[in-house]
Amino acid sequence: MHKLLEQLVDEMVNRGVHYEDAQREFDKRFVTQVINKCGGNLCKAADTLGVHRNTLSRKIKDLKIKNLA
């Protein structure tokens, strides 16, 4: 996994992707994946992510995540 992540970061740096854009895209994909794996159950997803459900709800809103499982 470290090798894949290193390759991805190298590619993003070479393409001039800004840190904030990379962080936002990672967060959006990571959170969406966890929610989908939890069958759309936000309480379970929040527990899996190690955050409070309210924090997850705020993150979903901030990241404009839609079409959850």
Locate predicted features.
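Bacterial C-terminal helix-turn-helix
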Residues: 2-69
